[in-house]
Amino acid sequence: MAGMIKYLQSFRFKGMTVILGVFLAISVVLWTERSGIQYQAEIKKKAYLDRDTVVTETQAVKNIESSCLVLMDSSQADSVEAWEQFERIFMDMKTGVDLADIRQSEIPDFSGYETIVVLMSDLNPLKDVVIKIGNWVEKGGRVLFALTLQKDIYVSIIEQKLGITDSDYGNVLVDKIYIDDDFMIGGGRSFQIPDAYDSAWEVSVGETAKVYAWTDDENKVPLIWENSYGKGKFVVDNFGLCEKATRGFFAASYSLLTDVMVYPVLNGSVFYLDDFPSPVPSGDGTYIKRDYGLSIKAFYTNIWWPDMLDLAEEHGVKYTGVIIDNYEDDVSGDVVEQEDVQRFQYFGNMLLHQGGELGYHGYNHQPLSLSNVDYANILPYKTWESYDAMKKAMTELIRFGKEMFPGTELSVYVPPSNVLSDEGREMIVKEFPEIRTIASNYFVGDMAYTQEFEVAEDGIVEQPRIISGAVIDDYMELAAVSELNMHFVNTHFMHPDDLLDEDRGARLGWEKLKKRLDEYMDWLYTSAPCLRNLTASELSGAIQRYGALVIDKDVSDQELNLKLDNFYDEAYIMIRMNEGTPGNIEGGELTHITGNLYLLRAKEKSVKIEIR
C-alpha cells in the first residue's frame, strides 16, 4: 500500500486523477440515488399483505366472545352519542360486548361478564339495578361509569362506593385536563379543552380513590379515578367530553378495570407532505420576502426543504410526499403532460433517498367529484365533466409518477383537500388497482372524506390523518394524545404552501412555524420513544395486521398467556398490568412505556409473560 501511495505521489498526471476522482464520486452519488429508488420499491412490496390473505376487522370481530356488558338508555341523547364512540372503541380494542338498551330490552344477569360499562349520566331509569351493580362489584365485578353522573337519589346510594367523600348538585368548568404521567402516554401535563363548558360533577374523593386526571386549576376536581370496593373496582370518567377526539381517554379508563388489559395497536407515525413534489406553489410570498428576501421558488429550494430534511434527520421521520401534477382547474379531461420535470425529480429523488415514499395527490387540485356533488360556497372547486374525464386525469397522474420515478411503487392516494366522492372512490378501486391506500381525514370537515383505521371490504386500506400543519391547536393536541393511547399512532400532514396562507400561520414566519413543528415532534417522540417512524404504505401494512388480530387472554397469578388469531408475522399489543409486573417473556419483546403500561411486539402466535 505504501508503495502504491508513493507511486501515485510521483504520478505526473495526478491532477487529472483528482478530476477523474471527482467525476467518479458524482457518478457514485447518482447511481446510489437511483439504486435507492429501487431499494424503496422492495421495501414497499413487503409492507402490504397479499390481498387474498387479508382479514378485515369487521370479519375478525364476528366471533369474539362477549366479556363486557354495556348499559345505555336510548332516551338520553348523551347515552346515544356515547355508544356511537364506544362501539368503535370496543371494536378496535377487540373487546366483545353485549349492548342492553334499558328502553328496549331486559338487563341480563351480570354473572357472565368480566366488566360492565354504564353509558348513562342519569341513573334514575336503572332504579334498583344501581344497587345490584354495587353488590356485583363488591363480589369482584369491574364497572366503568363513562359519562359525568348527575347527582340524584340513586347516584347518592352508590357515590360512597365510588370513593366520593363530598359532592354538589352542580357541575364545574373543565377547560384544562391534567393527565398523570403514569396513566396515559403523553401525560405529565395539561391539555386545553376547546369549547369548554361545565362538564364535570363537582366532587371530592377520599384516600381510597386513585386519581389519574383532574382539572388543572386550584380546585383540582377529579376527572378520571378508580376506587376499589370489596373484591372489585369502579372506574369513573367525570370530564364529560365523549367524541372521536377523546376515544383514547376512554380506552385508557377501560384498561384500568381488569388485572391485566390487552388490546392491539398500530405502533406507527407518519408525516405526510401534501402537494409535494409539485410545481412552484402559487400564493402570497409577502412573509417569505419579509423574512428572507427570496422568491417563493428559491425559498423552498434553499430554506424550507433543507430545514424539513434536518427535522427528519433529528427525529428519524420518513416523509411521505404525494405528487400533484399541476394547479390548473381544467376538468374537461383534456390532459396536458407536465414539461417542467426537473423540480419533481430533484425533490422526489431526495425524498426517496432520505428513506421516504411517494404517492398520488392529483392531476390537478380538483377533487374526484362529478356534477351531482355541490360544493356550494364551502369549497372553491369545480366538478369533473364526466367519469371519463376523471379517469383520464388519474391516468395521466399515474403515468407521470411512473415516468418520473421508475422502479418505485406508488400505492397511496391522498384526495385533494381530503375530498373524495363515492363515484371517485369507486373509480379508484375499479380502474387503478395499484392504489391500495386512501389517506384522508380522521375527523369530519368541510365535505371531507372521513375515515377509521381499517381495511375496507373492497380491500382498500383506509388511513386517516389526525392532525395537520405546523400550528398544532388545542383540539389537535387533545386528539394527538388521545390517539397515542387509542391506536398508538400519529398521522400528520402539512403543505409546502402553508407559508403562503395566513390562515395556516404564514404571518408567523417559517422560523416560528418550524419551531412549533419541532416542538410537536419532540413531545411525540419523548412521550413515545418506541413509536415506529413509518412511511404511508408501511403504516397500511400495520393497519392490515392490526385489523385482523384477535387476542385470547388467559391470566393466572403467575403468568399471562396470549393466543393470537389471524397472526401473520408480527403484531403490536398494548398491555396494562394493574396487578403485578412482567417478568420473563416467550414469543415476543416487551417495552415499558409509562406507569404500568407496556408495548408488546409479538413475534409468534403464542406469547407467555411471567407475572411477578
Language model region names:
Residues I64-C68, S199-G268:
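A glycine-centered loop/beta-turn motif at secondary-structure junctions
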Residues S66-S74, E138-K139, F145-E159, E313-E423, ...:
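Metal-dependent polysaccharide deacetylase catalytic core of the NodB/CE4 family, i.e.
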Residues T17-A25, S386-E457:
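Catalytic domains of cell-wall/extracellular-matrix polysaccharide-remodeling enzymes
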Residues N124-S190:
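A glycine-rich, often tryptophan-bearing local segment used as a flexible ligand/cofactor-contacting loop or short
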Residues N124-D128, T594-R612:
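C-terminal beta-strand-rich structural cap/linker in extracellular carbohydrate-active enzymes
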Residues C242-F250, V260-M350, Q354:
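Active-site beta->alpha N-cap acidic-glycine motif
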Residues N238-L241, M261-Y263, N267-V280, A312, ...:
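Catalytic grooves of carbohydrate-active enzymes
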Residues S75-K151:
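Helical hinge/lid and interdomain linker segments adjacent to catalytic or ligand-binding clefts
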